[in-house]
Amino acid sequence: MANHSSAKKVVRQTIKRTLINKKRSSAIKTFIKKVMYEISRGNKEDANLALSVAQSKIMQGVKKNIIKLNTASRKISRLSRQIKNLHKSE
């Protein structure tokens, strides 16, 4: 446990930041799940709309240092590829 007041403040700040980051990370995962749901339904238009929203949220997460840029790019690329393959299958 921290003894100095400045160390106690750092602990409080860390707890606060951790909660905020978990909330943002959870939101990103939720938007990705929405895209996956639309892909599983085979709904191209809704999947594209969900992807555009998810892409925005993912890149906001990069800006806030929730996830790394390469991870975000990989997730967006894989979702886009799945939607593209959905177009080909029909």
From Swiss-Prot:
<keyword id="KW-0694">RNA-binding</keyword>
<dbReference type="InterPro" id="IPR002583">
    <property type="entry name" value="Ribosomal_bS20"/>
</dbReference>
<dbReference type="GO" id="GO:0003735">
    <property type="term" value="F:structural constituent of ribosome"/>
</dbReference>
<comment type="similarity">
    <text>Belongs to the bacterial ribosomal protein bS20 family.</text>
</comment>
<comment type="function">
    <text>Binds directly to 16S ribosomal RNA.</text>
</comment>
<dbReference type="GO" id="GO:0015935">
    <property type="term" value="C:small ribosomal subunit"/>
</dbReference>
<keyword id="KW-0689">Ribosomal protein</keyword>
<dbReference type="InterPro" id="IPR036510">
    <property type="entry name" value="Ribosomal_bS20_sf"/>
</dbReference>
<dbReference type="GO" id="GO:0070181">
    <property type="term" value="F:small ribosomal subunit rRNA binding"/>
</dbReference>
<dbReference type="GO" id="GO:0006412">
    <property type="term" value="P:translation"/>
</dbReference>
<protein>
    <recommendedName>
        <fullName>Small ribosomal subunit protein bS20</fullName>
    </recommendedName>
</protein>
<keyword id="KW-0699">rRNA-binding</keyword>
<keyword id="KW-0687">Ribonucleoprotein</keyword>
<dbReference type="Pfam" id="PF01649">
    <property type="entry name" value="Ribosomal_S20p"/>
</dbReference>
